[in-house]
């Protein structure tokens, strides 16, 4: 009997050959090769390019790349080179298809499309054909031109893109050969060749009369709306608008390049295409072997044909005969004196500079007279009259406030009106509020901000009207009102205009601590960040009735708080805008430099008007201004 653990005799000799050989080295080599294979596969998938023809072309315009790419026949090169600069514009949903086309006009990702296509979209995305396939980028409105149905978008990215140069207006003549591009619902590019039919054509869109348009038969589908019309050099002749004519057929219009440059060169530094004398033929010899390609590209008007290997639908509106591309017919060039010529300073016309200065002056006067409302007027004016988006407005207003309220803080500190022991605990809350408000404002979008701004102005107008209707709101000037007669902050401000009255503090008492500091500092920052206003209209009443201090001290303390909140807002707006590719520092800094002098001078004028004009007149002007802002902002939604 064998018990557990016992063995009978000697164990047999190990005859397994594998265990007698060295196996670790080959297995290690095999494992390493497998790892390298998988790593290489992952790298290839990550760096896969559907079309490597455009490597190194990020900083080039279409025209520049077209000259460099000479391997294909001339028109085939055009059809192959233009589509990467043509984008689809749609909503922000994952499965949202394009509602219009667009054209990339700046290497940093600026896109021009039609305003009516994006005005009602809560979110905007841009679909771009890259070497790695179609990519989707979120975008924001930078500026709008309602009179020409244009919207300038900025993709939220710091990447570089192939883009268009702007065609020289002198080369645009009736009969000129052009190509209208777009992207269809599937994101595939489409193009039709045609001719410029007429210049300076009008188009009525609802109640808006659009002028200075080109007519072209190259536009045949709504999918080309917002897309580029280009010439044979690949330069942007204009942005397409597809309209339904009286017969129900699509009629093609184009907002020409000189209109685009005139209205948007304050934000984008456009590249200019090479000029060709009008009436001179542009002969391009087509390379040998292109006959077969043209036989594939030709199609009946209205029936696009896909070009094998190019993924593009081409409609041949005017068939090219022979081996030579058509020349430009002789004719009078399109001269647009309304948008071409004139002095430009930093990309701004003299008229635009005067308009911006006058807006800043009016905002300064309003703020100087009533110590509130100036920021509301500045933001609303930049949105309505100049079409700027909040991404550009906020850093401009913040920079303006830094200078204007910085100077006011120094004056108030010199007059010993700033209560530093009360202000210092509020500064962190004001900074936190403006940062939080900035991101909230970005999240809700410009349309919601416009509504909030209109409602805010409406409330301020109603408040002023109620005070006008009070029995004691007569025709007195600031000097004739005593502090005891001043029952609200507006009347009290008039009593303080001569600097002699010091009203008794009154209001709601809150215990000292973080909660009190938050109540006094956070709301001002939130309103400033969301709406882009200074926030003084919120802070002064809070300082007065919650802080229980006199109006003089409330105004002085508020100026310091607005200054530091604006400094923080400027830093956040520039850092966030630059890191996400939304803004570049040149545009907001230039705008601020234009507007700061007007705002500063306007504040001085407004302070003097407060001392000499009757109270009823001051309140009436203020109420009318706020009511006009509310009406415009709420009806333009």
Swiss-Prot record:
**Which region ranges are annotated with the description TSUP-like?**
370-637
PTM remark: Subject to proteolytic cleavage by MamE.
Q: Which cofactors go with this protein? A: a metal cation
Question: Topology: which residues are Lumenal?
Answer: 46-352, 400-416, 460-517, 576-586
Q: GO CC: one term?
A: magnetosome membrane
Q: What are the protein's GO molecular function terms?
A: metal ion binding; serine-type endopeptidase activity
Cytoplasmic-side positions: 1-24, 374-378, 438, 539-554, 608-616
Name one process (GO BP) from the record: proteolysis
Instruction: Explain the consequences of disrupting this gene.
Output: Cells have no magnetic response but still make empty magnetosome membranes; magnetosome proteins MamA and MamE localize normally. Deletion of genes mamH to mamV (amb0961 to amb0978) gives cells with no magnetosomes and no magnetic response.
- Give the stretches traversing the membrane: 25-45, 353-373, 379-399, 417-437, 439-459, 518-538, 555-575, 587-607, 617-637
Positions of the UniProt region annotated as Protease-like:
78-268
Q: What is the effect of changing residue 225 to A?
A: Wild-type magnetic response when amb1002 to amb1007 are also deleted, makes normal magnetite crystals at 30 degrees Celsius and room temperature. Complete loss of magnetic response
Q: Name one Pfam family in it.
A: TauE
The record ties this protein, via SUPFAM superfamilies, to: Trypsin-like serine proteases (SSF50494)
**Which NCBIfam families does the UniProt entry name for this protein?**
MamO
Note the PANTHER family from the entry: MEMBRANE TRANSPORTER PROTEIN MJ0441-RELATED, MEMBRANE TRANSPORTER PROTEIN YJNA-RELATED
| Reported function | Plays 2 roles; promotes magnetite nucleation/formation and activates the MamE protease. Despite its near conservation of a protease-like sequence, this is probably not a protease. Required in conjunction with MamP for proteolysis of at least MamE, itself and MamP. May transport a solute that controls MamE's protease activity. May place individual iron atoms into the magnetite lattice.
Q: What is this protein called?
A: Probable membrane transporter protein MamO
Q: Where does this protein come from, organism-wise?
A: Paramagnetospirillum magneticum (strain ATCC 700264 / AMB-1) (Magnetospirillum magneticum)
Mind giving the lineage of the organism this protein is from? Bacteria, Pseudomonadati, Pseudomonadota, Alphaproteobacteria, Rhodospirillales
């Amino acid at each position: 009997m064998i018990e557990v653990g016992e063995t009978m005799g000697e164990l047999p000799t190990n005859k397994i050959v594998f265990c007698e050989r060295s196996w670790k080295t080959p297995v290690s080599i095999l494992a390493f090769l497998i790892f390298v294979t998988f790593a290489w596969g992952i790298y290839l998938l990550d760096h896969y390019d559907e079309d490597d023809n455009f490597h190194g072309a990020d900083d080039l315009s279409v025209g520049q790349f077209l000259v460099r790419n000479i391997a294909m026949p001339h028109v085939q090169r055009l059809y192959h080179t233009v589509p990467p600069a043509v984008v689809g514009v749609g909503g922000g949903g994952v499965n949202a298809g394009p509602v219009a086309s667009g054209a990339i006009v700046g290497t940093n990702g600026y896109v021009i499309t039609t305003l009516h296509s994006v005005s009602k979209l809560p979110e905007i995305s841009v679909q771009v054909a890259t070497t790695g396939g179609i990519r989707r980028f979120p975008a924001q409105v930078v500026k709008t031109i309602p009179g020409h149905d244009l919207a300038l978008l900025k993709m939220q990215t710091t990447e570089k893109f192939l883009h268009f140069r702007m065609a020289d207006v002198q080369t645009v003549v009736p009969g000129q050969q052009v190509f209208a591009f777009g992207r269809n619902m599937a994101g595939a590019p489409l193009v039709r060749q045609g001719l410029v039919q007429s210049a300076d054509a009008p188009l009525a869109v609802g109640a808006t009369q659009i002028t200075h348009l080109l007519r072209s038969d190259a536009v045949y589908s709504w999918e080309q709306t917002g897309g580029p019309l280009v010439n044979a050099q690949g330069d942007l002749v204009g942005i397409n608008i597809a309209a339904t004519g009286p017969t129900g057929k699509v009629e093609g219009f184009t907002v020409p390049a000189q209109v685009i440059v005139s209205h948007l060169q304050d934000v984008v530094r456009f590249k200019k295409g090479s000029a060709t004398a009008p009436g001179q033929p542009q002969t391009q010899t087509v390379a040998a072997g292109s006959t077969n390609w043209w036989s594939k590209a030709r199609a009946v008007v209205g029936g696009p044909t896909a070009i094998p290997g190019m993924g593009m639908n081409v409609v041949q509106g005017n068939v090219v005969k022979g081996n030579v591309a058509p020349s430009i017919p002789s004719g009078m060039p399109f001269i647009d004196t309304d948008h071409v010529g004139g002095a430009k300073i930093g990309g701004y016309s003299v008229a635009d500079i005067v308009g911006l200065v006058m807006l800043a002056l009016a905002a300064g006067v309003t703020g100087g007279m009533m110590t509130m409302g100036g920021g509301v007027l500045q933001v609303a004016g930049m949105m309505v009259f100049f079409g700027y988006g909040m991404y550009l407005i906020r850093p401009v207003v913040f920079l303006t406030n830094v200078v204007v309220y910085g100077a006011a803080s120094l004056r108030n500190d010199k007059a010993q009106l700033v209560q530093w022991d009360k202000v210092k605990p509020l500064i962190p809350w004001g900074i936190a509020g403006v940062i939080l408000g900035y991101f909230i404002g970005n999240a809700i979008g410009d349309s919601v901000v416009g509504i909030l701004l209109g409602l805010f102005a409406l409330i301020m107008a109603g408040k002023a009207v109620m005070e006008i209707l009070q029995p004691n709101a007569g025709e007195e000037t600031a000097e004739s009102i005593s502090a005891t007669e001043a029952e609200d902050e507006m009347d009290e401000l008039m009593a303080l205009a001569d600097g002699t009255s010091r009203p008794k503090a009154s209001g709601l008492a809150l215990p000292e601590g973080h909660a009190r500091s938050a109540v006094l500092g956070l709301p001002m920052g939130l309103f400033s960040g969301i709406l882009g206003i200074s926030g003084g209209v919120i802070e002064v009443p809070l300082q007065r009735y919650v802080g229980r201090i006199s109006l003089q001290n409330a105004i002085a303390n508020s100026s310091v708080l607005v200054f530091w909140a604006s400094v923080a807002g400027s830093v956040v707006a520039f850092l966030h805008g630059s890191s996400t590719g939304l803004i570049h520092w040149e545009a907001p800094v230039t705008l601020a430099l234009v507007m700061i002098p007007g705002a500063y001078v306007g504040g001085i004028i407004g302070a003097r008007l407060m001392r000499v004009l009757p109270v009823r007149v001051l309140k009436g002007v203020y109420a009318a201004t706020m009511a006009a802002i509310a009406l415009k902002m709420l009806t333009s939604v």
